[in-house]
């Protein structure tokens, strides 16, 4: 790999990476029930999931003009998930109404050894509790199929660094997510309209403090203070014989993007 400083050749690197990844047996338990009582359908789903993995990485970065780098890192991750969902559905006035609740609890710990004197090691813990209630209605109004829904979420996200609670990175969200769709036909043209709001939460890998080594000038790290992305989506579709027209609009609030920052103040990099 050739590295340039402006137009001048700065250095030439040969990088070798050897990784040993051990994934321990995961444990998954599920309880499911489906039944019907007086025309009311009931679905109950409960899951328990636990797993952990360990990765050891050896990096040799050989330089033509400067010192060689030899780096060994060790990372461990432990995950536990408890989740349950209950849905009740009942026919009502020519349509159907369904509602229910779901709850999930996630406990995740990740430890990272760091890179010797170059990058500091980290020890993170995440606890997330998500409680949701939802209601959906489906009706046929004349020649139009209509459905509407509303979902409420109450999320607690607690972040710990080196066993200390971090109030700035911990979050509490309360959100409503509506949805609406209409489908029908005008002559030989079938049409559909839809609108909904959804959320895309950061992956845990994007939230942890551990730093991934690219080369001696490039590090990749997470950001515990990342916010969820809220997506407003609207769509219109029309079909006539073999022709299909689709128009969509999406608006992203707090979208997650990669950013590049230059570090010049010190050799030890912490996230």
Question: Where are the regions a protein language model picked out?
Answer:
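Face-selective signature of the C-terminal outer-membrane beta-barrel domain
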Residues: 1, 17-161, 185, 189-190, ...
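Outer-membrane beta-barrel translocator domains and adjoining extracellular loop/strand segments
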Residues: 1-14, 54-65, 109-118, 158-166, ...
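Short beta-strand-initiation
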Residues: 26-28, 83, 132, 177, ...
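Surface-exposed extracellular loop regions of Gram-negative outer-membrane beta-barrel proteins
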Residues: 154-159, 187-234, 247-266
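Feature captures outer-membrane beta-barrel proteins of Gram-negative bacteria and organelles
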Residues: 176-182, 234-238, 245-249
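Conserved small/polar residues in nucleotide/adenosyl-binding loops
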Residues: 269-270
């Amino acid at each position: 790999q050739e590295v340039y400083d402006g137009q001048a050749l700065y250095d030439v690197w040969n990088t070798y990476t050897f990784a040993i990844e051990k994934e321990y047996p995961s444990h998954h338990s599920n309880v499911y029930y489906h039944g019907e009582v007086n025309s009311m359908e009931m679905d109950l789903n409960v899951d328990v999931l636990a797993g952990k993995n360990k990765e050891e990485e050896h990096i040799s970065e050989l330089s033509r003009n400067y010192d060689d780098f030899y780096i060994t890192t060790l990372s461990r991750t432990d995950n536990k998930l408890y989740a349950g969902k209950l849905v009740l559905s009942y026919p009502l006035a020519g349509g159907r109404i369904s509602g229910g609740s779901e709850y999930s609890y996630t406990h995740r710990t990740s430890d990272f050894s760091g890179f010797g004197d170059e990058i500091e090691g980290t020890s993170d813990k995440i606890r997330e509790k998500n409680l949701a209630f939802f209601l959906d209605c489906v009706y046929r109004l004349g020649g139009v199929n209509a459905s509407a829904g509303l979902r409420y979420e109450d999320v607690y996200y607690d972040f710990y660094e080196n066993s200390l609670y971090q109030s700035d990175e911990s979050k509490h969200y309360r959100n409503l997510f509506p949805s609406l769709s209409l489908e029908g036909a005008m002559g030989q043209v079938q049409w559909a309209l839809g609108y909904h709001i959804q959320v895309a939460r950061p992956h845990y890998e994007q939230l942890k403090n551990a730093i991934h080594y690219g080369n001696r000038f490039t590090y990749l790290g997470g950001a515990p203070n990342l916010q969820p992305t809220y997506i407003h989506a609207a769509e219109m579709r029309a079909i006539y014989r073999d022709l299909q027209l689709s128009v969509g609009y999406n608006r992203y609030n707090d979208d997650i993007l990669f950013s590049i920052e230059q570090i010049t103040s010190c050799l030890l990099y912490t996230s």
